[in-house]
Amino acid sequence: MKMKMKLASFGLAAGLAAQVFLPYNALASTEHVTWNQQFQTPQFISGDLLKVNGTSPEELVYQYVEKNENKFKFHENAKDTLQLKEKKNDNLGFTFMRFQQTYKGIPVFGAVVTSHVKDGTLTALSGTLIPNLDTKGSLKSGKKLSEKQARDIAEKDLVANVTKEVPEYEQGKDTEFVVYVNGDEASLAYVVNLNFLTPEPGNWLYIIDAVDGKILNKFNQLDAAKPGDVKSITGTSTVGVGRGVLGDQKNINTTYSTYYYLQDNTRGNGIFTYDAKYRTTLPGSLWADADNQFFASYDAPAVDAHYYAGVTYDYYKNVHNRLSYDGNNAAIRSSVHYSQGYNNAFWNGSQMVYGDGDGQTFIPLSGGIDVVAHELTHAVTDYTAGLIYQNESGAINEAISDIFGTLVEFYANKNPDWEIGEDVYTPGISGDSLRSMSDPAKYGDPDHYSKRYTGTQDNGGVHINSGIINKAAYLISQGGTHYGVSVVGIGRDKLGKIFYRALTQYLTPTSNFSQLRAAAVQSATDLYGSTSQEVASVKQAFDAVGVK
């Protein structure tokens, strides 16, 4: 969730982040192209791209890339370089594929491409292929540092500049060897993940040059997801009753085994809610009660965390046919009463964590259904587009969580509105919220691309610039006139379907606002047809916020 105080961070690779829509050397009259400004290569292509009878969907992609090698500035063997990571058929008749670009078997950081094939025709290619890696002398020398040396460099910097003490790591120190590209420079590098809860929660990603040990990039990606181990109680499924943070009564699924536990066995591999008991050790104790009635004030945050996790699960299952955040029914864990007076909620990489607030800035954060759904949507994003939590890709990441947090609030019909966190933020100030999707400028966030934040605070403006996309989403749903551009609203349901398809099938880790526009337009085209009002409204909304 966004705090009013922003965090400092470095900028993401400019070459991956810089994209723009230009009428630049169109590949064919039937193709629509969004170009990467830095590389002057295609970033998003749609149309009837290639049809070869008797060819597999992935082979169409390889042939298309090689056929257009000069446009992509990509002169390597596509089949050897593009590693197929995912392939599935969707309910619209498309074969969807996700590829990871590699260089001599080494993954290129953030370089993911998705493609769509229908009726034997390649119809879309989304994502930036990093060009001319075969000409980079810096990649030919080989690595000189070990994984341990890279981790030591990252930890030393973390302690010196972030934590001021050696933290207790929650999930070890994961390290991956990659090719990292920043503008025209390419480096062999280690990606080091440092995940911890004390002295303050963090999930830092360091990019360390594997030759000279230089820190190439670093940022806090607290909402990145990895499944955690869950120990369940063997018992009888029951239904309890309790009262939430705002005093509303609700039924909750529990499990009986001597005590009644906040363990919901009816959804996927379970929903589990824990009591952190004001400590910072997770997950804490699985919440237990003697009589299956949760009406004590201490129970309220647990009641809401448990109930709203279930509502979020139901939304994704019933509306988008998605089973939990990973699409494979992963268990959902939540811990409440984290630390003392803690003014935040976050996904720590494997579970939800909720502070109780200090009573002035926040009340217990699990009391906001949009807060719960926002954070769980970060996990959905990590398992699909994998949007890097920095600069424009990070702002899209935040906006996606705001959009679906709001849509879950409407789905539950829980006093729904287009504000974020209004139920738990500043209880002494009526009508206040963290962000507004209908009017981002109300809280100082930009509502037009010309007003975007371009500094390094807030991971390059991930919460700030999300306002631009939030406003576009609001206009797509509700309609209106913004900066002189009129938008015809198409409703929340269609907004959700368009953005869910864009998130899960077209966006890639380094997507920027231009690619999001192209992805949303293509998703609307897939769902409703190229001449539909839905496509027109998506274009109008992005025009209204200055995203081309």
Swiss-Prot record:
Active site (UniProt): 375, 463 (proton donor)
Q: Which domain of life is it from?
A: Bacteria
| Cofactor binding: number and manner | Binds 4 Ca(2+) ions per subunit.
Query: One biological process GO term for this chain?
Result: proteolysis
Q: Where is the signal peptide?
A: 1-28
What keywords tag this UniProt record? Calcium, Hydrolase, Metal-binding, Metalloprotease, Protease, Secreted, Signal, Zinc, Zymogen
Q: Which family does it belong to?
A: Belongs to the peptidase M4 family.
Protein name, please?
Answer: Thermolysin
